[in-house]
Amino acid sequence: MERWSINDSAKIYNLNNWGADLFSINKKGNVCVHPSSNSKHSIDLRALVDDLIKRKIKPPILLRFMDVLQGRIASINRVFKNAIQENNYPAKYQTFYPIKVNQQRQVVEAIANFGKRYNIGLEVGSKPELVAGISFATGNNLPIICNGYKDTEYIEMVLSATKIGYDITLVVEKLFELEKIIELVKKTGVQPKLGIRVKLSSKGIGKWATSGGEDAKFGLRMSEIIAAIEMLEKHDLIKCVKLLHFHIGSQITKIDKIKTALIEGARIYAEMRKLGVGIEYLDIGGGLGVDYDGSKSSNFSSVNYSIEEYANDVIYQIKNICEDAGVECPNIISESGRATVAHYSVLVTNVLNTNTQNIMPDFEATLNEAEKLAPTVKKLEDIYKSIDRYSLREDYHDTLQLIQEAVSLFNLGYLTLNDRAMAEWLYGKIIRKINSIVEKIKPIPEELQNFQLSLRQTYFANFSLFQSVPDSWAIDQLFPIVPIQRLNQKPDVIASIADITCDSDGEITSFVGENGRTKFLPLHKIRKDEAYYIGFFLIGAYQEILGDMHNLFGDTNAVHITFNKKTGYIIDTVINGDATWESLKYVQYKGPEILKRVRDNLEKDVALRKISIEESSHFLELLDRTLLGYTYLGE
């Protein structure tokens, strides 16, 4: 038997590259989570899940590791502190967390509490987010930046909060907003902190490139900035402008795109300072990417730079422009939400079943006993018996042609159902035999490089793709997916992952592999009476809030975990996933009304003796239990 080590598993899933030193594999072959990069302490994910199931917390389970979240905040602030020192930058850096990236109260609360030591702020983009931000700022003097479109009520809320002591900066996204702000400032007499968002010609790259450039949704063009300055000077409000903001998109994969935007943004800042605008902060927005596939490249699911390089370039480029222009360097703000929260949550769920052919009838005896096989079946049998590495290419092509021929003959009535089943069975055996030969050939013939897709099985996992990893479906985002156990054993199956929704789109067919994106995931054969769990990693950004309720599969169970040197871990919070009645409530159904309607109808049937009292009671008991139960599948 071929020797297999945990290092081999780490390699095929590329774990050491996307894991940011936060994930590893222990000697038992289980995935572990570390509280911070290079920490010796860890939590065994498989052992943790087993403990949670003993506590009656069923999969799918969203695991939120709060120490990882704190570690990411600390890392971002540390690299900027180092960059400031190395470049002798004369101003400060400040992190603002954009609530939209993950609005869960416990997440924002953890960021706000831990971030106090770094004077972390919150960025909001709507009235509900503003209210959430104010709730965390209360008693904490937490600074808030307000982006997004604003109506009168939004602006009045900011002005009123400013008046009673909240530290809020109101960013002007459009000129018509400024007119409204000036009107309300005159009406209330409140002097707000104002920011101006500029529309750079520089663009990002990838799915969110349209956040920058001349056609961007938000921001003022150069002519509009001049108009805004004139309007503010006219109303004696130019002194209120404290911040300049730009944003060229999320997940910027190329560092040169960031450098270009920094140069343009810093130059605009310098010119506005020369015009007498007393800007104190330059908010460079988001864009700091996450290396989802570990390739350290400029493809959509990766980045070609490190967090250290990002921070150094930000500080260097801004300082260089300011010194060249002879203006004071600004305090720098970044809104790096994705890089802050992506790593801290892991979804773990169980595999329910597979479409493996192991349960198919064994036609070996039938083939041996059959006096006469259908010609197509006989040809497939002959290929299986004679195939070797020298006839590999030809036999593979013949097999593909013959299986199509079998389907056509069956449809025309020339093959029986049993004939077609034997043809499919032989096709599977031929493909597996080809694979056993191909594995020993270097290099693999070009025509055979994609044939492994014929071997790909479907593993059905207990989750909703649309609820838990919607970006995988919506924008083909790659997320690392790894079995959390048996990684000291060689995987013997290549698979896709299908969810339990009634939608053919609910399947993942692109994965993080050793050499980048791959069309299959190496997994292990399912053992009888042994649970097999897979983990979805780096899903902390956007996935929870973007998830929808396809087939009414609701929120999953969520558990907040902190590390403990003595006990390994402590469960801080358990948030129960949606029960069936809660999912139904989202679409205007009411559990009591459903029960009453069914009960009334059953009583009529009992009275007419169509069913017994016992049958009625049993059904109502099942219905009540289902309404109160988890929307996902049990045993």
Swiss-Prot record:
Pfam families: Arg_decarb_HB (PF17810), Arg_decarbox_C (PF17944), Orn_Arg_deC_N (PF02784). Pathway: Amine and polyamine biosynthesis; agmatine biosynthesis; agmatine from L-arginine: step 1/1. Gene3D superfamilies: 1.10.287.3440, 1.20.58.930, Alanine racemase (3.20.20.10), Lyase, Ornithine Decarboxylase, Chain A, domain 1 (2.40.37.10). Keywords: Decarboxylase, Lyase, Magnesium, Metal-binding, Polyamine biosynthesis, Pyridoxal phosphate, Spermidine biosynthesis. CDD domains: PLPDE_III_ADC. Coiled coil: none annotated. It catalyses: L-arginine + H(+) = agmatine + CO2. InterPro entries: Ala_racemase/Decarboxylase_C, Arg_decarb_HB, Arg_decarbox_C, Arg_decrbxlase, De-COase2_CS, De-COase2_N, De-COase2_pyr-phos_BS, Orn/DAP/Arg_de-COase. The modification N6-(pyridoxal phosphate)lysine is found at residue 100. GO terms for biological process: arginine catabolic process; putrescine biosynthetic process from arginine; spermidine biosynthetic process. Its EC number is 4.1.1.19. It comes from the Bacteria. It is an enzyme of class 4 (lyase). Substrate binds at residues 282-292. Its cofactor is Mg(2+); pyridoxal 5'-phosphate. One of its GO terms (molecular function) is arginine decarboxylase activity. Catalyzes the biosynthesis of agmatine from arginine. NCBIfam families: PRK05354.1, speA. Belongs to the Orn/Lys/Arg decarboxylase class-II family. SpeA subfamily. This is Biosynthetic arginine decarboxylase. It comes from Geotalea uraniireducens (strain Rf4).
